[in-house]
């Protein structure tokens, strides 16, 4: 591309300062209230998911994509699909928190301990997040209580 950079297999996209600066600009622009455009995370050219190091780095990158507000991820190889789909599913804990936040949005209290008991659900600040979680739950599904994405991508040997 423009900067003559190609990622090495030891790094995820967030380890590159130029890429993270661009990603930040895209998110800040497209995630504004008046636009609220869902943004798919960028592609990773590494697809040998039989290599545990590459697979774990890919998972880390998808987790960071989600943390930064991306929805889904562009895939270039069939071996990437199962991992992206598994990590796109909504955890039971997030689903329960989102339901609680939406249900209590107009509450006089404003904040309550989450159903898991380890964090606070702030109704006004987390409302937009909760709506997004509910939409994604409808699309990708919700994991059962006590189950995480690893159950969906266990090796099929």
Regions found by a protein language model. Give the residues of each.
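Expand to "…catalyze enediolate/carbanion chemistry for C-C bond making/breaking, isomerization
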Residues: 1-157
């Amino acid at each position: 591309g423009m900067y003559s950079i190609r990622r090495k297999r030891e790094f995820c996209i967030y380890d590159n300062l130029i890429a993270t600066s661009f990603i930040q600009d895209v998110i800040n622009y497209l995630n504004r209230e008046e636009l609220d455009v869902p943004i798919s995370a960028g592609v990773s050219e590494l697809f040998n998911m039989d290599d545990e190091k590459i697979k774990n780095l890919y998972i880390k990158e998808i987790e960071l994509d989600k943390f930064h507000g991306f929805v889904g991820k562009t895939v270039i190889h069939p071996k990437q699909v199962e991992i992206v789909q598994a990590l796109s599913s909504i955890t039971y804990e997030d689903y329960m928190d989102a339901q609680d936040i939406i249900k209590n949005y107009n509450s006089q209290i404003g904040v309550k301990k989450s159903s898991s008991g380890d964090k606070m659900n702030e109704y006004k600040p987390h409302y937009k997040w909760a709506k997004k979680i509910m939409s994604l739950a409808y699309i990708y599904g919700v994991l059962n209580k006590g189950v995480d994405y690893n159950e969906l991508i266990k090796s099929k040997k």
